[in-house]
Each structure stands twice: as structure tokens, then as C-alpha cells.
Amino acid sequence: MAFSQQPERMLLFIQALQMQRTDLQVLLLTTVIICTSMKASASDSIEFARDVLIVDTHIDVPYRVYRHPEIDVTVSDETGDFDLPRMQAGGLNAAFMSIFIPASVDEAGGAKALADDLINLVHGIVAIAPEKLAIATCVADIYRHQKAGLASLPMGIENGAPIEGNLDNVSYFREKGIRYITLAHSKSNHISDSSYDTNEHWGGLSDFGKQLIPAMNDQGIMVDISHLSDAAAWQVLEVSKTPVIASHSALRHFVPGFHRNMTDEMVKAVGKNGGVVQINFGSSFVTAKARTWMNELIAEIKAYKEENQLDDKDPTLTDFRKQWAVQHPFPFAGLSDVLDHIGRVVDLAGIDHVGIGSDYDGVGKTLPVDLKDVS
């Protein structure tokens, strides 16, 4: 029976989460997941949220605001999945701000400069509402902020391109407040192969990537294996001397053939390593039906481009996508689907090794029916 269909296991899970307060266990489940699954009242949800420390390890706010500087996430702004009022309503204590570097920037140059801009942007968000928000660089900061009634914004880099082949940049970004680095993103880079890139340049990690891991270990920056090819993920687990994380991934067991997700053996290995797997909320990450829909859309767009000799920036592609989506409604996942991924990590690696990495503001309009925003 699926984890989400076993209330007694869910209750034990909640009780265990309430008792855990160690450094790695600040990576807890959101109240909305637990309380909705248990059909608790709104007041019960709020009470639970106040009793535990809730952390989401991956939210793509900075790049959204960078592209649309008119957005102010310290006030209500429903153009995206995240803003401060909804963060407070959901009881989220700490939201890792993703310093996302697109692969196109990596190829064109300027990755480090963009990372600096995005980090400064996060500091700018905090400066707008210092009585409500604070930058966090360690677990103690998050606990202190919680007691003071402040929401925490720790930071992680998504795509290691800003390292730019220079190990000195590891300490540089640590001083800037970065506490994890996702080694690659949608394409292989100078550090690692990507799960999305069919051209595997390195057979896993590059030689520089194998040097980078110990440097990150020494600086106290967590190594994030989300987005990596299988070979790269296994090599990280072999090389790293400290626990690794998957900041926003899900399980391949439920979506066979989707290499962006983790295998059961990887989950077990992360647990043995002492790390944490944070579950991504995107529907196409958590159900095979949604992934099939996405694959079919990609194939249809590719065929349409080739038939009409269009490039990737042609505006007619947007119209084609919208029309196709109207004719083929997207099969949104539900809360229970996300819970099943969480439950399987518990079964495979133990309760100490599961968390959430929602990917809010990063997976577009594919969020599950019951998890549409951070509230």
C-alpha cells in the first residue's frame, strides 16, 4: 500500500519529525503536506507549523526577480509561487534561494558575474524587510531567526558554472553566503555531466570536478547531486568526505526512464553517506503520466520546428505549445503522489534522510493540485 494511504505510518512520521532537531534534520516536511494528508483543521496546521522548523532547500525566486525587477516578494505577489506573506502563511522558516545560472550563460561567459548579481539581489530582498527576513549561513542562524520571528533565506548555487575552473572561487562564494552548489544543470559543464545532456563529456565528473569536491568539503559547502548524470552522482558519493544532498530531486521508481530522478540505490547510498534527498514537487518529476505528457509535448514541438524550419526563439512555438496543451490537458499530480516519494525515501534510507526541495518558481505551471504555492 502506498505511503500516502497509510494514516498510521503518516502519524508516526509526523511524531518523529517533531522530535528531531539535529543539523541535517532541519530539512523537514512542509505543514501543508502533513496536515492535508491527515485531514487536519486549519488551526491544527498552523499549530504544527509553529512547533517545527520547516526548510525548503530549493526555491527559484532570485532569477525570477532578476528577469522581472518590478517584482517585490516581500509583499503579496501572485505572479509566482513564492512571496513573504505566503511563506509566513505556510509556516516556512527557511527557504534556500537558488542562485540559478542558465546553461546558456555558462556557454556565453559571465556565470560568476551573474551569480554575484543574484546574491546581491537576495540581500536586496532582505534589505526591504529586515524586520521580517534575514540571510542565514548556518543552522544556528535559522534557529535564532525563528526565535526572533524572522524568516531565513540561506542560499545555494544551481549550476557550478560560476566556479569558472578556479578553486579559489569556492572560498569566494562561501564568504558570499553560499552553502551548497548543484554541480551542473541542463547541460554538462566544466565540472560534471548533466542528466539532461545526451552528450556526456566526462563520463561523470571532470578532473576539475574531482578536485572541486574536496575543496567544497573543506569549505563547508554541501555538494548537490541533483541534475547530475548517474555516473557523476556515484562519483560524487565516492569522492566526498562529507554528506551530500539532492536539493530538489524525486525517485525514478515512480517515473521509470527519467534520469533526472534518483534510483533506489542512489537514495540508499545518500542515506549511508549521511546526506538528505529533498523531494521535488513538479508533477512531471513525481508521476509517469505527467512525464509522458511532457515527453510527448517535447516531441511535438521538435517535429513542428523541423517541419516549418523554425529556430528555438520563433514566437509561433509559444502559440503551438498553448494550442497543443489545450487539446491535451496536463495530468497534474496530487499531494499523495509527492507523499509516496517521501515515503519511499523513508523506507529506503530512513526518516533522517528525507526533506523537501519544492522547486517553486522553477517548474512552471506543473505543480500538483494541492501544492500550487509556498503557502
Language model features with spans:
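N-terminal hydrophobic targeting/anchoring segments and the immediately downstream early-domain regions
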Residues: 41-202, 252, 256-375
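Short hydrophobic/aromatic-enriched beta-strand-loop microsegments
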Residues: 243-249
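Distinct, well-ordered alpha-helical segments
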Residues: 166-170, 232-242
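Substrate-binding cleft of carbohydrate-active enzyme catalytic domains
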Residues: 214-225, 229-235, 266-272, 344
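Bacterial N-terminal signal peptides
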Residues: 26-36
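Active-site glycine-rich loop that binds ribose-phosphate moieties when present
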Residues: 203-211
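Bacterial N-terminal signal peptides that target proteins for export
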Residues: 8-10, 16-27
